[in-house]
Curated annotation (Swiss-Prot):
An example molecular function term from Gene Ontology annotations: structural constituent of ribosome
NCBIfam families membership: rplM_bact
Stored Gene3D superfamilies: Ribosomal protein L13 (3.90.1180.10)
Organism: Alteromonas mediterranea (strain DSM 17117 / CIP 110805 / LMG 28347 / Deep ecotype)
Family: Belongs to the universal ribosomal protein uL13 family.
Chain's gene name: rplM
Alphabetized Pfam families for the sequence: Ribosomal_L13
Protein name in UniProt: Large ribosomal subunit protein uL13
Quaternary assembly: Part of the 50S ribosomal subunit.
Function: This protein is one of the early assembly proteins of the 50S ribosomal subunit, although it is not seen to bind rRNA by itself. It is important during the early stages of 50S assembly.
C-alpha cells in the first residue's frame, strides 16, 4: 500500500469565521495555525498547502493572561543603526489590533514560501464586520 499524497489541485478548502472575543491569544493562535496548515484533515501532507481559510473577527478583544498586557513586548527594526523600535501589548492592541494576532500565528507557521501561502489564507478584522459574506463561512467555535 502506498502512502497517500495530497495534490494541490484536489484540496478542498473551506471558509471559517472565528470570534476572538475574550479568547486567550496563544491558545487561539495555535488552533488557527493548525487549521491554516490543514493538520486537522486526514489528507494532510507536509509539503502541500491543505489548510482552510480563516476569518478572525473582534481581534481587538483578544485576551492575555497575567501581566502580559503591560510586559509583553513587540520589536521591529528599521535596518539602520539604533533603529530598534519596541512597543508593548497594550499600545499595539490600541494602535493595530490585527497585528497582534497576525504576529502570533505567523510565528507558528512554517518559514518559507509554503508558510507564506498558508498565512495569506488568514484574514483578521478588528471589529465584528468582515467582507467575506460571499464565501459563506461557517462559524468555528474554538
Amino acid at each position: 500500500m502506498k502512502t497517500f499524497v495530497a495534490k494541490p489541485e484536489t484540496v478542498q478548502r473551506d471558509w471559517y469565521v472565528v470570534d476572538a472575543t475574550d479568547k486567550t491569544l496563544g491558545r487561539l493562535a495555535s488552533e488557527i495555525a493548525l487549521r491554516l496548515r490543514g493538520k486537522h484533515k486526514p489528507e494532510y501532507t507536509p509539503h502541500v498547502d491543505t489548510g482552510d481559510y480563516i476569518i478572525v473577527i473582534n481581534a481587538e478583544k483578544v485576551a492575555v493572561t497575567g501581566r502580559k498586557a503591560q510586559d509583553k513586548m513587540y520589536y521591529a527594526h528599521s535596518g539602520y543603526p539604533g533603529g530598534l523600535k519596541e512597543t508593548n501589548f497594550e499600545k499595539l492592541i490600541a494602535h493595530k489590533p490585527e497585528m497582534v494576532l497576525e504576529k502570533a500565528v505567523k510565528g507558528m507557521l512554517p518559514k518559507g514560501p509554503l508558510g507564506r501561502a498558508m498565512f495569506r489564507k488568514m484574514k483578521v478584522y478588528a471589529g465584528a464586520e468582515h467582507s467575506h459574506a460571499a464565501q459563506q463561512p461557517q462559524v468555528l467555535d474554538i
